[in-house]
Amino acid sequence: MSSTMSFDNLAKVLAVLVAEQGSYTYVDKLGYVPSKDLAVFYLKEALRDLHSIQQKEKFENEKARELVGKIDYERVEKELEDIAKTDERKELREKTSLIAAKALALSAKLGGGSGE
């Protein structure tokens, strides 16, 4: 796994979705994704949902709103490129599992998720 890539920003994206939507859908999908193409697709869908949430006048979870402000979208782009360049399935699983685990840890701090 790339030693310089932490995937913290993608984890933040997913954590906000868990906290705001009360759903683990993207975390679960990413944790078990079989290919890089599907991983990038799921992350694109998550980013689209995040953008929809950002358009809302008020977040339901104030901590999630604060975390959105800390997302570095340039880093998100680099993290996505790193995943898209991953050729080994084992390495892809390591990366996507790391993102999912970090997202769950962050969402717990935010008080998110409904226990689905």
UniProtKB/Swiss-Prot annotation:
It comes from the Archaea. InterPro entries: CRISPR-assoc_Cas5 (IPR010157). NCBIfam families: cas_Csa5. This is Uncharacterized protein AF_1870. The lineage of its organism: Archaea, Methanobacteriati, Methanobacteriota, Archaeoglobi, Archaeoglobales.
